[in-house]
Amino acid sequence: KSNLAQALGIRAIQDGFTVYYIRTATLLEDIKHSRIDGTYTNLVKRFARYKLLILDDFGVSAISVDDATNLFEIIEARNQLCSTIITSQLPVKDWYGYLQNNTVADAILDRVVHSSHRVTLEGDSLRPKYGKIDENYE
């Protein structure tokens, strides 16, 4: 999933688009820090400007209700204006439980699912094949 998203991001850059790749957990941490240091509005505007935002590993790390609301703010700022790729091992049907707040989950899913192209990948991870550690590594 990550490799495919990165390949699409590279192609978008080659075609002249602005692209930003970030793990979802890192984005949520950045948002928390921006709320503390007073740069939240600028952060949301910055993420709204990229023609393609790649949110990798959605659903891997636990999030709070505040995190879900913050994620909604980013998605809302980009809604209908720019493209967003979300990679996840979590089936969409499980997003309600993951996001913990049905109102926020409804808002996010309404913006993401109804205007998306879903790609479901089957098969084993490529990491064991291409990400092998040298056998001499200690």
Predicted regions and their residues:
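Walker A/P-loop
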Residues: 1-17
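Walker B motif beta-strand of ABC-family P-loop ATPases
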Residues: 52
